[in-house]
């Protein structure tokens, strides 16, 4: 698909990086109105740099399809080409290539489409969204090469959620703003997030924060998912990139999920275009500030004293008898929708800091490090 798209449109360029555990390289598709002739020049471009990751869990394929539609529509529409003339949009078509090649129709039995998809684990059965900082896999090493080649201002990682049931077809999981820290974190929390929600509302797309509940129902309140550096957005945050994971809802129709992922990505592009100067200035200052610091936060915990109220649209949940286990299971009654104020805890406090050393000493045998 992307080979044909690049052959037909000079704005699309294809690149390969490193190798994944499958033996295949990791691919990168780049949109730039003027084309890309030297990939190493991207990281210093004055344009907005956006990196999109798809298929880290290949059964969660919404972003794979949405990205194909999105890039096709941009290059085939002169008004969109003009609109995003100041953006470089970089797409990893499928990050987990080994898992994508392991195709089936039964490992996500509770998901409403597509008919066939890849497997969650990679060629060595690693969950790649737990491997970014430790880099046990070749995939994560290739990702790091792509990431530092692009140096994205904004990073998007597309997923599908397995969890509670509610009315939304899509949720957002922004990187935790206290961890991002400083003025850049405040910008993410108080400007980028609410503006994206407004953009999507104008498109009739209802969105809410990722519903981070386990063994209970959302109306009891829930905290923001904490994306440590083992996760994609936790890793990219280490380099002052504004990151978010997209989590569509597995029970909603596949077409709806793909369309809303598509609309969210366009909304991110629009916000980035409109706030380009501010984003680049904040990232530059954040990098300078961290070099001047004497300490660095390592551990965080949710602040239960601070919360905001979400106008949450869910379904009534109850415990019913399970026909499989003879015990009880949680059941959401889609015939009983509700709209309630729900407490959402998205403030985190630092619980441990370290003094930043001048250097780390590694013995020669630790070549993997």
Locate predicted features.
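Soluble metallo-hydrolase cores and metallopeptidase-like ectodomains found primarily
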Residues: 2-52
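Structural signal for hydrophobic packing residues in well-ordered secondary-structure cores
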Residues: 6, 75-78, 147, 200-204, ...
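Short secondary-structure junctions
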Residues: 10-16, 207-209, 369
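Conserved beta-strand scaffold positions in the cores of enzyme catalytic domains, especially
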Residues: 14, 28, 91, 125, ...
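Active-site-proximal beta-strand/loop segments in catalytic clefts of secreted hydrolases
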Residues: 17-19, 31-33, 54-56, 92-96, ...
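Short, solvent-exposed loop/turn elements at domain surfaces
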Residues: 37-39, 60-61, 101, 255, ...
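Active-site/substrate-binding loop(s) of hydrolase catalytic cores
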Residues: 44-53, 61-219, 224-230
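Hard-cation-handling environments
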Residues: 213-369
């Amino acid at each position: 698909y992307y080979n044909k798209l690049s052959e037909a449109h000079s704005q699309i360029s294809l690149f390969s990086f490193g190798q994944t555990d499958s033996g295949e390289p990791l691919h990168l598709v780049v949109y730039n109105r003027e084309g890309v002739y030297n990939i190493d020049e991207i990281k210093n471009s004055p344009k907005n740099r956006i990196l999109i990751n798809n298929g880290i869990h290949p059964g969660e394929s919404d972003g794979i399809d949405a990205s194909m539609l999105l890039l096709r529509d941009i290059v085939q529409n002169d008004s969109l080409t003009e609109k995003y003339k100041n953006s470089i949009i970089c797409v990893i078509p499928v990050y987990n290539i080994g898992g994508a090649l392991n195709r089936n129709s039964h490992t996500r039995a509770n998901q409403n489409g597509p008919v066939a998809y890849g497997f969650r684990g990679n060629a060595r059965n690693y969950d790649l969204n737990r491997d970014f900082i430790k880099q046990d896999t070749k995939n994560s090493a290739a990702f790091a090469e792509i990431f530092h080649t692009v140096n994205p201002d904004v990073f998007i990682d597309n997923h599908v959620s397995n969890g509670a049931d509610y009315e939304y077809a899509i949720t957002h999981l922004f990187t935790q703003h206290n961890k991002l820290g400083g003025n850049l974190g405040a910008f993410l929390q108080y400007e980028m997030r609410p503006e994206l929600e407004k953009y999507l509302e104008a498109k009739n797309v209802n969105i809410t924060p990722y519903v981070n509940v386990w063994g209970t129902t959302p109306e009891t309140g829930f905290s923001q998912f904490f994306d440590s550096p083992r996760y994609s957005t936790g890793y990219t945050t280490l380099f002052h990139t504004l990151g978010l994971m997209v989590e569509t809802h597995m029970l909603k129709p596949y077409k709806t999920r793909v369309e809303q992922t598509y609309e969210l990505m366009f909304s991110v592009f629009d916000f980035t275009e409109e706030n380009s100067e501010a984003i680049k200035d904040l990232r530059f200052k954040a990098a300078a500030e961290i070099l001047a610091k004497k300490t660095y936060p390592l551990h965080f915990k949710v602040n239960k004293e601070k919360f905001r109220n979400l106008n949450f649209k869910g379904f009534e949940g109850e415990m019913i008898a399970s026909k499989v286990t003879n015990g009880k299971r949680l059941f959401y009654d889609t015939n009983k929708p509700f709209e309630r104020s729900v407490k959402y805890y998205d403030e985190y406090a630092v619980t441990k800091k370290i003094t930043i050393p001048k250097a780390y000493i590694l013995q020669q045998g630790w070549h993997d490090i």
